[in-house]
Amino acid sequence: MFGNQFDISGKMVGENTNPVLLYAVETCLQLTLAELNENLREIYVEAYTVPENIELIHKKTAVQLQKIFVPYLPDYSASDFYEMEIGTAAFMRGYMARPCDMYFTLERKLARFLSMSLSVFKVPQEEQEAILSYIENLNIREIANKVMQQLFVTLEMKYEFTLTN
């Protein structure tokens, strides 16, 4: 489920896009999926909580983070990115676990998450603003709904069940 989102995000923003933009779209997609479906929220929160699962997430994501953010942190080692992944995964888990409300809307959640995580990786402010603007102009709910439907169809085929409306 997690790996497929990078593929979907890549198709959305284009093959040769800025990797930081791809990271932003992918993480916003995860947060939006959790917000739109309580079952997915539970799955994500559990994945970010169960020790065996989160360790796998940390290891795989740290490799991706190093590829994406090494231009901003050229002196950082693989272990530095692993340690940073532990922290940014905590951002993700916390934001997934907390449903939006009238004060903390999805738009504010996405903007705050990106501001915090991109700052950790020392992405320049101007680039952060351009990425936030791009995300704000996406219909992230519609995109997440399409991804969710694709996910459910895949699950139906793999596990031979049917979801009813």
Regions found by a protein language model. Name each.
Residues 7-40, 46-50, 56-63:
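Hydrophobic alpha-helical connector segments
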Residues 25, 46-100, 104-118:
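Amphipathic alpha-helical packing segments from all-alpha helical-bundle domains
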Residues 9-13, 41, 95-103:
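Secondary-structure edge/capping motif, primarily at the C-terminal ends of alpha-helices
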Residues 41-46, 126-130:
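Short, hydrophobic secondary-structure boundary micro-motifs
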Residues 17, 74-81, 125-131:
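Short, surface-exposed acidic
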